[in-house]
Amino acid sequence: MDLSLLKNLSAARILVVGDVMLDRYWYGDSGRISPEAPVPVVKVSKLEDKAGGAANVAKNIARLDGKVGLLGLIGEDEGGQILEGILEGEKINSQLVSVCDLPTISKMRVISRHQQVVRLDLEETFTEQHSQLLLNRLELVLDEYDFIVFSDYNKGSLSLIENMISLAKKAGKTVLVDPKSSDLHLYRGADYITPNLNEFKLAGGQTDSEEGLATSARKLISDAGIKAMLLTRSEQGMSLISATEKYDFAAQELEVSDVTGAGDTVIATLAVMLGAGMTPKNAVEIANLAAGIAVSKLGAATVSPEELSRKLGQYLHATGEHYQTPFDDVLQHIEFAKQNGETIVFTNGCFDILHAGHVRYLAQAKARGDRLVVGLNNDASISRLKGADRPINPLDERAMVLSALSSVDWVIPFGSADENDTPAKLIEQISPDILVKGGDYTVEQIAGAEHVLLHGGKVEVLEFLDGCSTSKVISKIKQ
């Protein structure tokens, strides 16, 4: 995965078209039953309004730093005014079209003790005449965008979606659709559709086996003239299916608080990552991580680049890929962690043959803060320090082993004869909050200590485990 593309999220120029909604939340305590009917009485203590539907897709894109526009229909009412006010506070080029004869789609949820008690929907279905207003506006703004996302909640805004997709494809745009209709032919020409499992079944998809699922998905997209399907499968994760390939992505193991808007997060993240230049497979990997974050929050939630960066770091750690992360990307991840208020700890060493002393030492170092960065001497550096017969294990293998430890967040190679094989320059680049060194050093003897102290950090010396050293391990093996 090319993590450098995460710096390029603002390159995505995305237009969201579809059913915009106002999500309203009324929070309160429910300690008694109504004397009028056998229903709970909720004493409302807090009101909250959020952008929903297609507006939530646009909000997700904006929060990921994508350049986004929004087309949708609202009524000439209070709900429309509130929704426009919410969107004004976001980095969204909002172009909502007001109609006088129908209300703004609004969903009011009563929440008590983290549970939804009831939902009230205020809506009427928009007609083709209303949809024509969006089609006309789409034609005017199409040249400003590279990706077009259609968010279909079957509320009528996209009654003319076939015409809209045709218009977008003729203009050379990449089209993504979050579908609601079971007739996938309505989305002919789309590059990606993102149905959930229930929508897939209603469209004729088979789920009895993985082979049957893939076969039926390929038939559906082939018949409908669609390039690929990203099937969201709840606890089974996601599957990206095209005519020749199928990639499966496991669901993220997080506590699910609310699945509201999870599909919005998926298609928004997919569009942003594709716009940044990622491959479809990598873009879906990131979208899967974003969905895991979103469902752990209450309500239609968004995901920030910082949250995504942290989750990506955990994911790469779990898959054993993070030791291969380019240096500039590691620095960016560290900076995100700092912005989130996390304490960065740094230590360094050769770690030629990992032993119990190393493991305990690294765990103690990690306990000093939130994230641990390990500077790892490269092979040439170790040879200069330890002799021509060292290292025993090459850099890549040492980095892989260290990266498998839960205490280690990032491994960064270093070592230059010009710098006396110390990590001083690396420490200046990272500027950790805490610098840890093992052994009987004084603070004055520790490379990089002066920089850390000068910038308000701390320096600590930890004791090594008696009887544990790489030299002793090598000696014992030779015996």
UniProtKB/Swiss-Prot annotation:
Gene3D superfamilies, A to Z: 3.40.1190.20, HUPs
Residues at the active site: 264
EC identifiers of the protein: 2.7.1.167, 2.7.7.70
A single GO cellular-component term on record: cytosol
One Pfam family in the UniProt entry: CTP_transf_like
Protein's UniProt name: Bifunctional protein HldE
Gene: hldE
Disulfide bonds: none
Pathway entry: Nucleotide-sugar biosynthesis; ADP-L-glycero-beta-D-manno-heptose biosynthesis; ADP-L-glycero-beta-D-manno-heptose from D-glycero-beta-D-manno-heptose 7-phosphate: step 1/4; Nucleotide-sugar biosynthesis; ADP-L-glycero-beta-D-manno-heptose biosynthesis; ADP-L-glycero-beta-D-manno-heptose from D-glycero-beta-D-manno-heptose 7-phosphate: step 3/4
SUPFAM superfamilies: Nucleotidylyl transferase, Ribokinase-like
Binding site for ATP: 196-199
Catalytic activity, as annotated: D-glycero-beta-D-manno-heptose 7-phosphate + ATP = D-glycero-beta-D-manno-heptose 1,7-bisphosphate + ADP + H(+); D-glycero-beta-D-manno-heptose 1-phosphate + ATP + H(+) = ADP-D-glycero-beta-D-manno-heptose + diphosphate
GO biological process: ADP-L-glycero-beta-D-manno-heptose biosynthetic process
